[in-house]
Structures are given as structure tokens and as C-alpha cells.
């Protein structure tokens, strides 16, 4: 059973690593994620990761309580580095060679982000974890994922969430919400479906970088997705919109 993709970028939210109360780092979750990543790596797939920091700090929340927005965002970037190190440790305990590259220079614990070096790591089948966001305030880690995926030539972005795709409405609030199996970037933006921020979606749209939104918490989903099973919601430049059950 081979992979549909040669090189992928997995976007993980901070909550994928969160402990009780959606805060901190749960090492069991980190090791579970590392096992899922190893299964895909064993298929010969080159893997890059971008991880958020919301389980530790959300810059936008700090800005709301009076901290300067740029300062708050820098604090959030540092949180992503903590998560990246936790994920690196978990992956290496599974025997995976891993490199953390940070957009913010922090040389004693991570490489500085250099595109050509990142590509070389991927070619050598090392896991590359991109941390520190874009290195600039006001940009989300979703935008980081879009930017890095385009820069290092990934085939697809796999956006790992706690829901099994993109819905017509919030399924927690609307029992009639339907899941899209496929939707275009433009429709996602126009309908304000909150898949990613508009900057991230626009970057993917302009560079023809498909996104698949899926549930990372269901064991085996990542491998099934990479091997071609129809899981989650595909967002692409195709204007064909498909809704489950229709």
C-alpha cells in the first residue's frame, strides 16, 4: 500500500498536544501523534510539520487583555517552539530523525529556518518541524503552514483538527450541518467557513496548494488519508462543490 503523496505538510494545532483543560503538553498525545507520523514516514513520505501554540499561549487573547499585539504574537511564537521541541522528542523516541527549524533565531535549541536546508533535510527523509510562526507578528500559524508548504514544494497540506472536515455550519450548534467532501478556496473564503484565515487560503489558492481538513484524533486517519482514502474535506481550486449525502 503506497502513498498518494511524495511530500506533505501536516498542520497541527496546539490543542493536538494539549493536556487537561486544553492547556499544557500531554506527552501521551505527543507520542500518539509521533506513532501516526511514523506510520506515514514508513511509507516513504517526506514529512514537514507546523505546530501552533494555543495550548500554551494565544497571542490574540493576550492582546485582548492589554498586552501589545506584536509582543503577544511573539510570545505565541515562543509557545510554538516549545510544542515543536516536545514533538521532536516524541518523534525521536520512535526512531525518526527530526529537525526543528525556527523563524526566530534560537540557535542553541533549533536551526534557523533556511529553505534550501529544509528541503535537503526532507530529501534525506528527516522530519522537519517548522516553529516560530513566520517570525512576524499578525500572521497565524495557518499562514505559516501555507507559506512553508509552498516554499519547500509540498504536494498537499493536511490540516489536522478535532473535527472530520469542513461543515456548512457549526455541527455542534446546528444539527442540520452537512460536511463538504470538496469545496473551492474561493467558496471557503466567501462563505467564511473559518477553515483557515483568508491570508492562508489566498496563498494556497494562488499557488495551487490543496488542503485536506481531517480529524487527527481518530487513530489511523493520517495513514488512510495519505494512502488515498476519501477522508475529510478537500479544499482546492476546483469549482466542484460536493456535500456528503447530496
Swiss-Prot record:
The gene is pyrH. Its main location: cytoplasm. GO terms for biological process: 'de novo' CTP biosynthetic process; UDP biosynthetic process. This is Uridylate kinase. Inhibited by UTP. It is found in: Cytoplasm. Its EC number is 2.7.4.22. Catalyzes the reversible phosphorylation of UMP to UDP.
